Regions:
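A broadly used, surface-exposed interaction patch
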Residues: 68-94
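A short, glycine/Asx- and small/polar-enriched loop/turn
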Residues: 61-65, 116-118
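Catalytic cores of NTP-dependent nucleotidyl/adenyl transfer enzymes across multiple folds
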Residues: 19, 23, 27-30, 100, ...
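Short secondary-structure junctions
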Residues: 40-44, 97-106
Length: 200
């Protein structure tokens, strides 16, 4: 077996195995929140998968998943002045009402939904005109912060095309190494270092 074939097999071995289950959970969460905020049960509208899974750099055994739920802009006035925790709590209750046996709780910036094999961190957000998002931080009385995941995902996708998909491959291999050796390094840092390495 050539070195190329060994790397190909390595990437097959670390590929996410439970995509269908992950997508099912994302859909369930989205439907619960669409029902609460929009009286709709769409499993796909108004969410954005972020984190390593959203950037396509996750590997087999991924245990923490991240998503944004885009709250209708009509709700902004209700929460803008000190309503950060209230928005997170409403998000939690909507999921808890729909799935009462699942552990769901507010954790400062997100609502954590704990499933048997992985957990999902759900962040309710308001979309801004520049395609960024405003999200609640419930710490110390509450504040609003901004994030630009669409720009990050677009930059990753563009760079992946320029580098013949090697960026995502390198990110996945680095994650496997990190997991194997217990290195304390976050996924975004891995992706950033891999991006910078291939860029330079």
């Amino acid at each position: 077996m050539s070195v190329t074939d060994k790397f190909k097999q390595f990437l097959v071995n670390i590929k996410v195995q439970n995509d269908a289950q992950i997508e099912l959970r994302y859909g369930e969460i989205t439907a619960a929140l669409n029902k609460e905020f929009r009286d709709s049960e769409s499993k796909t509208a108004n969410n954005l998968q972020v984190g390593s899974y959203g950037r396509w750099t996750a590997i087999k055994g991924v245990s923490d998943l991240d998503m944004l739920y885009i709250v209708p802009s009509s709700q902004w006035d209700k929460y803008k002045d000190g309503g950060q925790y209230a928005l997170l709590d409403r998000t939690k209750k909507a999921m808890k009402d729909r799935y009462p046996r699942t552990e769901v709780f507010v954790d400062r910036l997100v609502v954590r939904v704990l499933y048997k094999d992985f957990h999902v961190e759900v962040q309710p957000v308001f979309e801004l005109t520049d395609n960024s998002f405003r999200y609640p931080d419930s710490y110390n009385g509450g504040s609003w912060k901004n994030t630009k995941p669409r720009a990050e995902i677009a930059a990753m996708t563009e760079f992946v095309g320029e580098k013949n998909k090697n960026l995502r491959r390198l990110c996945k291999m680095a994650r496997a190494w990190k997991n194997k050796h217990g290195v304390g390094m976050g996924g975004l840092l891995i992706d950033t270092l891999a991006h910078n390495f291939l860029r330079d």
